[in-house]
Amino acid sequence: MENDDITVAEMKPKKRAGRRIFKETRHPIYRGVRRRDGDKWVCEVREPIHQRRVWLGTYPTADMAARAHDVAVLALRGRSACLNFSDSAWRLPVPASTDPDTIRRTAAEAAEMFRPPEFSTGITVLPSASEFDTSDEGVAGMMMRLAEEPLMSPPRSYIDMNTSVYVDEEMCYEDLSLWSY
């Protein structure tokens, strides 16, 4: 999709919300995004012909919800979609069909690509102390395996690897001092 064909929300300002509740919850910039429970953002779009709502999910950030919205409107409206981000047309996946479940699944996958690290759901499980074998046999076995493994030579330096570069070694170490006073 060409960038000239894209309509970005910045170029087409949103209409003012009529009801007070929507004034308080909807995002001031992003289309199709509103706040729920203070710290969560939800997203939904309407199908162009049937006017049925397609629920896209709840997200920790407004940016993620806006990306989900962009995936859905690209699937439903194609080139006439009004996007929240100008790079969404080439950066985000477009669902294979206009089925609401397919749109929802693709929108969730696209939003996950933009999940900030502080909202990561990855859980690191540390082993308990009982899982470590600290007995003499365990340590001795580990030492024997290390002794049997072949020694590896240290990695070559950059200068040794790159033979096309001429380097005057005296010039490299001219201002290098071993001691700082």
Curated annotation (Swiss-Prot):
GO terms for molecular function: DNA binding; DNA-binding transcription factor activity. One of its GO terms (cellular component) is nucleus. Keywords: Activator, DNA-binding, Nucleus, Transcription, Transcription regulation. It comes from the Eukaryota. A motif (Nuclear localization signal) lies at residues 14-26. Residues 29-86 bind DNA. The keyword Nucleus applies. One of its GO terms (biological process) is regulation of gibberellin biosynthetic process. It is found in: Nucleus. SUPFAM superfamilies: DNA-binding domain. Pfam families: AP2 (PF00847). Transcriptional activator that binds specifically to the DNA sequence 5'-[AG]CCGAC-3'. Binding to the C-repeat/DRE element mediates cold or dehydration-inducible transcription. CBF/DREB1 factors play a key role in freezing tolerance and cold acclimation. This is Dehydration-responsive element-binding protein 1E. The gene is DREB1E.
